[in-house]
């Protein structure tokens, strides 16, 4: 499955140097800082929707003030993909959304557009592409992640013209 990982250029420099997206790293979203919205160590967090990866990269940019955003596109074998129980806990504390899906993974991917894997993503072992976006060169960057809080089906069927154009013109590069 093609999945995406969004981060800031400051963090991506280390990823490029190491040639790996690490499952154990310093987290932006910690229990101490974010309460229920924290990320568990030992996982690489991913999304099945490219503008959502950009949204997460932008949220991280607001913290570390990086000059650019980086989104990685990775081909992950289906058997490695796990539900993002952190996002499910945060977004669906009562479990109502989970009840509508036949599996936690489907709920995670199609309701919350997130998942995770419990291994590092080595550039030598996975097919990885990326693009870099200079934050200051995009007018109204928030327009690129319109409907970020909506489920996968809604987001992908309601892309704006700006989003469609952006997605079509992404200059993917192989790492």
Tell me the role of every PLM-derived stretch:
Residues 68-175:
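Active-site and NAD+-binding cores of ADP-ribose-processing enzymes
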Residues 22, 35-45, 82, 108-116:
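Low-complexity, flexible helical/coil segments
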Residues 12-13, 54, 81:
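Eukaryotic short linear interaction motifs
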Residues 50-64:
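Short active-site loop/helix that positions an aromatic residue
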């Amino acid at each position: 499955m093609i999945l995406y990982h969004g981060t800031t250029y400051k963090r991506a420099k280390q990823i490029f140097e190491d040639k790996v997206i690490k499952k154990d790293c310093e987290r932006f979203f910690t229990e101490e800082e974010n309460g229920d919205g924290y990320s568990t160590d030992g996982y690489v967090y991913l999304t099945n929707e490219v503008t959502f990866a950009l949204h997460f990269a932008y949220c991280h940019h607001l913290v570390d003030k990086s000059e650019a955003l980086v989104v990685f596109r990775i081909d992950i074998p289906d058997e490695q993909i796990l539900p993002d129980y952190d996002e499910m806990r945060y977004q669906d504390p009562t479990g109502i959304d989970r009840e509508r899906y036949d599996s936690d993974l489907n709920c995670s991917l199609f309701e919350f557009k997130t998942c995770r894997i419990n291994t590092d993503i080595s550039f030598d072992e996975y097919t990885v592409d990326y693009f870099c976006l200079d934050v200051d060169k995009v007018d109204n960057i928030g327009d690129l992640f319109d409907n970020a809080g909506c489920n996968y089906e809604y987001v992908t069927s309601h892309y704006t013209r700006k989003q469609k154009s952006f997605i079509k013109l992404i200059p993917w590069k192989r790492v």
